[in-house]
C-alpha cells in the first residue's frame, strides 16, 4: 500500500477541483474565483497546520487536532499544477486507473485529461 507522496506520484497533485461544465462555460469568473480561493486555502493550511487542525477538529469526532496537524504537514499543499502540467498528471493517474480496471481499457489517458482539464485561471 502506498500513497501519492511516494514514488512516481510524489510530485503529482493529490486533489483536483471538479467544476460543472456549465459554470466554466457560462460563469468563468465565478469558476476562477472558486479555484483561486481553494488554492489560497491550501496555502494557508500548509503555512498554518496547527491552526487548521484545531479548526477542523471541531467538525470530527474521530481525530484530535494533535493527530490531524502531522497529517496536514505531510500533504503537498504547495503543488498547484496548471494547464499542461495538470493534464500530464491527470493522464498519469488515468493510466493507473486503467491498470486497476477502474477505467475501461479503451480509455485514452491523454484524451481523458484533455477532455476534463480546463485552466479557468488562464487569461
What are these regions (language model features)?
Residues 1-58:
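Pocket-lining segment of extracytoplasmic ligand-binding domains
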Residues 51-123:
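An extracytoplasmic/periplasmic, membrane-proximal ligand-sensing/linker region
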